[in-house]
Amino acid sequence: MAKEASGNVYFDVYANEESLGRIVMKLEDDIVPKTAKNFRTLCERPKGEGYKGSTFHRIIPGFMVQGGDYTAHNGTGGRSIYGEKFPDENFELKHTKEGILSMANCGAHTNGSQFFITLGKTQWLDEKHVVFGEVVEGMDVVHKIAKYGSESGQVKKGYRIEIRDCGVLGSN
């Protein structure tokens, strides 16, 4: 397990053809190993099979940015490495600040590939969404992404906020 669980992951994010920068995230392998492995693996897969080329499809300024639907690209799809969905691992970690990385779902035990990054403390999501990491570099990029959102969550017309590249940074 220790061999797999190494290195932070990154997203290189673009708004159409403009680079917004890189987000680097630390995953909590010791606390939520199955959830962290799912996310890390989807960061390593080629375009069409994971996060590379997928978008942030739901962006609510002051709340969160959501992505990870690499199958339908609109919030209705996505798939975990374990099959369609997998159970909530635990709720040990909490939504205590901006930059928290957590699983998006549509109810208990419906984790797939969709995730969100918080833009502030969102404690009402505790016990409902599995926290599995946090942003360690590039929170400014997350705030840039937020500028393309709306209260309804829709991305500003004419913009595609894409994870152009992603992967795992060197082993620790």
Curated annotation (Swiss-Prot):
Catalysis performed (reactions): [protein]-peptidylproline (omega=180) = [protein]-peptidylproline (omega=0)
Compartment annotation: Cytoplasm
Segments forming domain PPIase cyclophilin-type: 10-168
GO CC term (a single one): cytoplasm
Cross-referenced SUPFAM superfamilies: Cyclophilin-like
Keywords per UniProt: Cytoplasm, Isomerase, Rotamase
Gene Ontology BP annotations: protein folding
Main location: cytoplasm
The EC number(s) this enzyme carries: 5.2.1.8
Pfam families named in the record: Pro_isomerase
EC main group: isomerase
InterPro entries, sorted: Cyclophilin-like_dom_sf, Cyclophilin-type_PPIase, Cyclophilin-type_PPIase_CS, Cyclophilin-type_PPIase_dom
GO function terms (MF aspect): cyclosporin A binding; peptidyl-prolyl cis-trans isomerase activity
Coiled-coil spans in chain: none
Stated role: PPIases accelerate the folding of proteins. They catalyze the cis-trans isomerization of proline imidic peptide bonds in oligopeptides.
Family of the protein in this entry: Belongs to the cyclophilin-type PPIase family.
Descriptive protein name: Peptidyl-prolyl cis-trans isomerase
Taxonomic source organism: Encephalitozoon cuniculi (strain GB-M1)
Organism taxonomic ancestry: Eukaryota, Fungi, Fungi incertae sedis, Microsporidia, Unikaryonidae
Underlying gene: CPR1
